[in-house]
């Protein structure tokens, strides 16, 4: 059985722990308790291959900026998460999380994950954001951010309804077992005759 280490990063309160608990236990946790570090494990079949998926939950809070990278060595794939209803967490994907991951693990695939997709159409949430002249992050914005940080894929999910949840982890595994073919840069230069 192939073992894959998947580390989940992103701002505090974007839903990283809920994502992992909902995926591994099929239950949505009730209250928010900030994570320092937690590990989860799941044995799954993807494309007919048995996989032991080691899931590393990290703290998004700035207090842990020096501690968090200790979980990065030997990572096979990163999930960089932002909340669809938190534009600031979306901006931090390229402002903080992408650069942090690239610095510590430059050649490891990244899946960009928009969490809380069930809240995008929630009227109360929309009104709260509008009061601050903000809007939920669109799917198209997610695709743009994926290209900006050179992620393998952009996916959205809801830990509450489990919509898109299994796909996130299946695609994370696929990014490791079927890595994307790197485009070789053609060498342009001049020929001296």
Curated annotation (Swiss-Prot):
Gene3D superfamilies per UniProt: P-loop containing nucleotide triphosphate hydrolases
Keyword line: Cell membrane, GTP-binding, Lipoprotein, Membrane, Methylation, Nucleotide-binding, Prenylation
Residue span of motif Effector region: 32-40
Residues annotated as binding GTP: 11-17, 57-61, 115-118
One GO cellular component, as annotated: plasma membrane
Disulfide links within the chain: none
Organism domain of life: Eukaryota
The protein's assembly and partners: Interacts with pakB. Interacts (in GTP-bound form) with rgaA.
Protein name: Rho-related protein rac1C
Organism of origin: Dictyostelium discoideum (Social amoeba)
Lineage: Eukaryota, Amoebozoa, Evosea, Eumycetozoa, Dictyostelia
Name of the coding gene: rac1C
């Amino acid at each position: 059985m192939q073992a894959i280490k998947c580390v989940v990063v992103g701002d505090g309160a974007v839903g990283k722990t809920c994502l992992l608990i909902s995926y591994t236990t099929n239950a949505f946790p009730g209250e928010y308790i900030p994570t320092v570090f937690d590990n989860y494990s799941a044995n799954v079949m993807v494309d007919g291959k048995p996989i032991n998926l080691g899931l590393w939950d990290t703290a998004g809070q700035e207090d842990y900026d020096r501690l968090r990278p200790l979980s990065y060595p030997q990572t096979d794939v990163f999930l960089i998460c932002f909340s669809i209803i938190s534009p600031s967490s979306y901006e931090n994907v390229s402002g903080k999380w992408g650069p942090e991951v690239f610095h510590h693990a430059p050649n490891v695939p990244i899946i960009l994950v928009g969490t809380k997709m069930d809240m995008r159409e929630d009227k109360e949430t929309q009104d709260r954001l509008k009061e601050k002249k903000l809007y939920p992050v669109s799917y198209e914005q997610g695709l743009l951010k994926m290209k900006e940080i050179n992620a393998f894929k952009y996916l959205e999910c809801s830990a509450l309804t489990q919509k898109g949840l299994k796909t996130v982890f299946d695609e994370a595994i696929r990014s490791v077992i079927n890595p994307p073919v790197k485009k070789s840069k053609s060498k342009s230069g001049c020929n001296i005759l």
